[in-house]
Amino acid sequence: MSNINAKTGKQFIIIIDEWDVLIRDEAAEFEVQDEYINFLRGLFKGTEPMKYIGLAYITGILPIKKLKTQSALNNFDEYTMLDAGELAGYIGFTQDEVKTLCTEYGADFEKVKHWYDGYRLGDYHIYNPKAVVSVVTKRLFQSYWSQTGSYETIIPLISKNFDGLKNAIIEMLSGDMVKVDTGTFQNDAVNFSNRDDIITYLIHLGYLAYDEKCKCAYIPNEEVRQELLKATRQKKWKEFIEFEKQSDNLLDSTLDMDNKKVSEIIEKIHMEYASVIKYNDENSLSSVLTIAYLSSMKYYFTPIRELPAGRGFADFVYLPKPEYTDFYPALVIELKWNKNVRTALEQIKQKQYPKSLLSYTGDILIVGIIYDKKDKVHKCEIERYEK
């Protein structure tokens, strides 16, 4: 290229699609990867390539691999799922584009949004184009993920024995966000040193979304949630399978208005998933509720947070999905400490009616759960709400 440029005076435009195939598919072949990275560095690094390359455009799932803490090709501008910059509106379909398609094809936008929205890049809500096109043409609300990627690739990742990884996955499956430090990830599929590296990789793969403002990861939508659930039900995730049974029992007991059983299960989950240090921390209250009611995600939307944690309570509203409104009531659940269980229920009633339920016409259960900070005993009382 240098010789051609010297003779013609013309520069090259180089386009490489899926630059990271060797990084992902040959993850254990370190010599192959080193040779490949050195080839790219020879092609793009230094002042000489600037003479004969007018533009280089490289696409892939992963950012450019790091050598120690620096990018192997630091003369590129990178746009990623962590920071899409000015390209944010071009990485997928924007919400306005999806609304237009829904109008054109007569699809229910709110349902499309629930299933396929969730990625936040800059000021944009970004949707997976493959999923949107499939749902508006086929009229089937389901996961189209398996047609563009395999969940089997993440089973070894989420099965790694990093402290806090499995709990973080369960929290996100329950609808919560988890804090993540994306800075240590080496941008490859091998050098994972902690749970944050795994979570960052899953963000780049699209299985998780990233909130840049609060530095948190979360599951973006129902489609991706379905795929992650498939992965967590594999044999290596025996702990999750057991936990899911426990959560199933909790939801059934709540719907049966079995106060004693709900108290026992919540207490057990609180003991298992809140460390001794954080057991009485206000912020752990929300995690206890969302984790405990993980199984509700089959029939309910992601829980709506009505009140902030930090004052000794956590308040959530669970609305059933449209296809389940005839069979499942809405749930208003409040967890408080050092209070009388009747007080918890009365406060739910006395508060201004939750905004998220104003237009809801189905049955409603209000669930008051309290625990004592000293003896850690939980109590529960459930009532059917009369409008």
Regions found by a protein language model. Give the residues of each.
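Active-site metal-binding core of divalent-cation-utilizing nuclease and nuclease-like domains
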Residues: N3-T8, M297-D326
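Switch/connector loops and helix/strand junctions flanking conserved nucleotide-binding motifs
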Residues: L22-R24, K65-S71, V341-A344, K374-E381
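Acidic-basic catalytic patches of nuclease active cores, encompassing PD-(D/E)XK
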Residues: M271-P303
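Conserved catalytic cores of phosphodiester-cleaving nucleases, focusing on short active-site segments
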Residues: L289, A314-Y318, Y328-K339, K351
